[in-house]
Amino acid sequence: MSKLNKDILFLIFEELQDDSKSLFSCLMVNRTWCEIVIPILWRNPWCYDIKYYNKSYLFAIIVSYLSDDIKESLTKQGSQLPLVSYQVLLFDYLSFCRSINVKTIRSITSIGSYMTYNQFLLQQEFYSLFMKKFPELKYLNMKSIKHQIFYFPEAKFRFESLYELVCDTSIDPSYFYGLAWICQHIHRLIVVNVNPQVYHAIAKLIKVQKNLKYFEWEDDYGLPTTGSDPYKEILLALEKKVDTINHLKLFFIYKDRTSQKVLPKFHKLKTLITDFGPFSEEQLKFFIYRDLEIFEIDYYELKAASIIIENSGGKLKKIFFVSSYELDDYINNFDDDSRIFIRRVYESCPLVEYLSLVFPPSKEHFNEFEKLLKICQNLKSLFLIIYMNEVEPEKKLLLENGEELLKILIRSAPTNLREIRFLYDVEFSLEALEEFLEKWRGRPILSILTCRPIYKEENYVKLINKYKNNGIIKDFRCESFMNVVNINFNI
């Protein structure tokens, strides 16, 4: 590695840009590695898993860029700044930076003072400094912002290159109008709706974008609603961008008529994550996405999912169920809809790699599941929800479900399979699990995730460790329901 030239090292470290632990370790290898890693780390220094209010050195680095006059003024106001150091910084850190995270900046400035007014002054000086020192601004998370940073003299030149904006609706509309004036090349726009209002300013920002590719909207508030068609302006603005948007994520609390007209027009979508609850079966037939690759939908919408999948273009690689709550006993037509869903997947999505399935443990469903495994040979990850529609299924039934499931996986699992997640009404006896792991020998190393606490018992832990040591399984973890649904494995 030490003999690799700088260009190759840069490409390697670029792949680690989201892995702060590895990048920080690389800093310590030698000067060459350090010189390559620092610009990567400082491109977006606020995105790493750091308790910023404890990191006084980061505060000190930024303060060191302030002029003596500004430092003196801030000190007179009551801010506690680091002692002046005449040692020259090894790097011009801010010249590498291309991002601002308002929440993190607020956390950092709390080091200088506990008083809100003094923190505001510090933040103002930091933002002014960033506008002068940053070569460009690519990423801005301005949730709960209090500073009109786009009115600094240099702001226009920095904001012209803004690529990603994360915001929320607690922000005064004037901020969105200000951004719309200078930011017209945003590719990714993420909005958290925490304050129902008239969304004219956000709609204006959407309308002026020339190449918006990714849009995300998430409602994060309770009742009451703001009207009968609260998202109309947002959806009509998005309608003007159907030729550029290919990633769409919408979580609306309220249903409206406009979405029925607008959503079918996004004919270039590659990612679709939304709720189809308000649409009838006839309406859903007009939702045709031939380029769709990633599709996420709620557990309860099996029929809608089947229709979307059937009308897709066969390019789907990820089909995933999302939910913030657990399944209950009120899933209508569960047996029929789950069987049809499995069939639609293996008929229409032969290239699928990441797949969620929910079905009852009947012989017919197990047969359909096995057909799917034999056809979908690209599968890397399976999320299996075996659900019996019973309050407390007998343990005997849970073990029978588990034994049948493991037999099917041994017989028919594709060779690419690296990860399996199990939820609900399935449990593995010690004997069945050992037989499965023994027969898995010689296949790709496997990660398993489940939420049943039985696997924390001593005899199971001993068995799992045995097959970990033998290289049969990479991981076998028992987690909470939400972790099983949401946690990311590196497969």
Per-segment meaning from a language model:
Residues I273, D291-E296, S306-V358, F366-K371, ...:
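C-terminal capping region of solenoid repeat domains
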Residues K6, F10, R31, E35, ...:
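Amphipathic alpha-helical interface elements that mediate macromolecular binding in regulatory proteins
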Residues D92-S99, M131-Y139, K156-E164, W181-R188, ...:
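Leucine-rich repeat
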Residues M1-V166, S170-I190, V194-E216, D220-Y221, ...:
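N-terminal adaptor-interaction module of cullin-RING ubiquitin ligase components
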Residues M1, S25, L89, E125-K132, ...:
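Recurring C-terminal helix/loop segment of individual leucine-rich repeat
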Residues D18-K21, Y254, Y300, G314:
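Alpha-helical structural elements of signaling/regulatory helical domains
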Residues N101-R106, T116, N141-H147, V166-D172, ...:
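Concave beta-strand-loop units of leucine-rich repeat
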Residues N54-I61, D69, A201, E233, ...:
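Exposed alpha-helical structural elements
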